[in-house]
Amino acid sequence: MTTPTPPVLLRTAGELHARVRRGRRAVVMTMGALHEGHATLIRTARDIAGPDGEVVVTVFVNPLQFGAGEDLDRYPRTLDADLEIAGRAGADAVFAPAVDEVYPGGEPQVRVTAGPMGGRLEGASRPGHFDGMLTVVAKLLHLTRPDLALYGQKDAQQLALIRRMVRDLNFGVEIVGVPTVREEDGLALSSRNRYLSTAERRTALALSQALFAGLDRHAAQEALCARAREVPATQARAEALSALGESRAAADAHAVATSAPGSATAVRDAARLVLDDAARATPPLELDYLALVDPSDFTEIGDDHTGEAVLAVAARVGATRLIDNVHLTFGPLGAAS
């Protein structure tokens, strides 16, 4: 087994620009504290760029993304470990600039604004967060000059906003979304997971469990729609309900039985039941939001929605704030998606 070549550590824009370009350049932007989710992004970038291309990982804890009372000073900084993980995953270079390298004139007076989508969900909970995120992404795209940039789907709203910025401002870079990586028990990988105590981690599992409950509800409803074309509706509903399992509470089952096929309300309700239980746990889960939204603009969808949707959740467990989401597709009434 060959030992991977350590990535070149670059600290300044001059060092980055002095590198001779070869093939396609793929960039993976991180705030450090790398984990398997980041490694998956880097490996995917390596596969897309190919052996003749170049993979650059950025490590920069962006102060503009942290609001008052958030965890900027607490955010883990583990550059030596990051270099090792990035190298094993196939990175050629790691660009880890200081704050004054990215913002040489101090806090920038001109910023990218996230628009209406940036004020919803995460933006409502963290005012200014997405303006700061888009500003640093724009700067890093200019500095790294990639052909493509990869981002995790766990940060679904961030990914949607980056795609919108790249389109609206003609950046000429391909944006690639990579599916969320999870622990065996379903918890989405996050650099902030290391803050959780054993008890807090047990409570935090409710985020993914709630999303999976929503997916189960959605699958049952879509199966009901498909079967409705072939058998009486009453029989189809009974079969769909059985797919949810006998462990569901009676009230939970009743919600499916009385909701319209493809009902967004029923999907939300199934997820909320899990979160309500977690709110009574020790330690409790403090829900920030649960939303079922259109991925094009992150507005809430209604029961008549067809097409793609994102079921998203954010909550605090102890001092740690976590987010997660899943994607699903609603078919038209009476038809499978």
From Swiss-Prot:
EC number in record: 6.3.2.1
Keyword Zinc among record annotations: no
Catalytic activity field: (R)-pantoate + beta-alanine + ATP = (R)-pantothenate + AMP + diphosphate + H(+)
Pathways per UniProt: Cofactor biosynthesis; (R)-pantothenate biosynthesis; (R)-pantothenate from (R)-pantoate and beta-alanine: step 1/1
GO MF terms held by the record: ATP binding; pantoate-beta-alanine ligase activity
Binding site for beta-alanine: 65
Binding-site positions, ATP: 31-38, 152-155, 181, 189-192
Annotated residues for binding of (R)-pantoate: 65, 158
Class of the enzyme per the UniProt entry, highest EC level: ligase
Localization: Cytoplasm
Pfam families: Pantoate_ligase
Active-site residues (renumbered): 38
An annotated GO cellular component: cytosol
SUPFAM superfamilies: Nucleotidylyl transferase
InterPro entries: Pantoate_ligase, Pantoate_ligase_C, Rossmann-like_a/b/a_fold
UniProt GO BP: pantothenate biosynthetic process
Keyword Transmembrane helix: no
Entries under PANTHER family matching the protein: CYTIDYLATE KINASE/PANTOATE-BETA-ALANINE LIGASE, PANTOATE--BETA-ALANINE LIGASE
Assembly and interaction partners: Homodimer.
Family: Belongs to the pantothenate synthetase family.
Protein role: Catalyzes the condensation of pantoate with beta-alanine in an ATP-dependent reaction via a pantoyl-adenylate intermediate.
Name of protein: Pantothenate synthetase
Taxonomic placement: Bacteria, Bacillati, Actinomycetota, Actinomycetes, Kitasatosporales
Gene that produces this protein: panC
